[in-house]
Amino acid sequence: EGVGISEGNSISSIEFEFNGWGNNYELNNQTIKLSHVSESSIPDNSYPDYRDLTLSNTLTVISDFDLRISSSRNWVQITFDTPFVWNGSDNILISWENRDGTWASNYGYVEGSSSFSNRSARPVSGGSQTPDP
């Protein structure tokens, strides 16, 4: 059983802790997708490579949204347009796609935990290079 969620229950939002961002930094045209994944870890690559993962039920839970980071360290809750139903057994892969195409200085990072040694990220530019889980 997942932390606070049982099989068949819906996930309708997610929270991230943003750190080091300039006040009122804007993230435009963002998309978040969730997938069931049977593997217990992500390959140790310098960028997301989902080709060797067994993904199912990939769902765009929110797309084309804008986000403003109000302070340099802040928890932000993102409510999904479409809830994701967890199957009760698989892990969940969260894919965040920045489809804005531009960037500005004063961007920061999203806090993580050192217990997640198999996480990865890759900056991508241009719509044709966006990883597709």
Language-model regions, residue ranges each:
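A short beta-strand-loop element at or near the start of a globular domain
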Residues: E1-W21
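Short N-terminal amphipathic alpha-helices
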Residues: S10, N24-Q30
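Small cysteine-rich, disulfide-bonded extracellular modules of the LU/uPAR three-finger superfamily
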Residues: S10-E15, S40-I42, L53, D132-P133
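Intrinsically disordered, low-complexity boundary segments flanking structured domains
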Residues: N19-G22, G108-Y109, S128
